[in-house]
């Protein structure tokens, strides 16, 4: 539902959406998620993981959708990657976003919020948006690297 709402808002404000489909290489899309054909989406094939940072930096705004929205700890890897790259991020809310990332991204919950934020960002991010993104990059690099997770895992299992 959130993704459909974002597609509608972007279409209404004529904000182009570029989607890099991680499932584009699959032979059968019968059971796979299909993007709507009438949403004005610019579809791209999947990328090698090593190119994702370059792609995130190419766009003024990146969208994230957390499919798990009730977890205290789970968020998409994409959220961390976009923030780590210094990207301006628009995302849906979840407990972990609220607790750890709210200050570094634009959290939208409904169509009116999404329209307001995305229309403003489409016109060009302002200094506050850029400062928020830069702070997000510092925060992720300081608290959410693989090294941090491995240390946390080692501590948890008394390794």
Name each model feature, range by range.
Residues 1-103:
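Nucleotide-sugar donor-binding catalytic core of glycosyltransferases
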Residues 49, 94, 111-115, 126, ...:
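Residues at or immediately preceding the N-termini of alpha-helices
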Residues 77, 109, 144:
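Residue-level signal for the nucleotide or nucleotide-sugar donor/cofactor binding architecture
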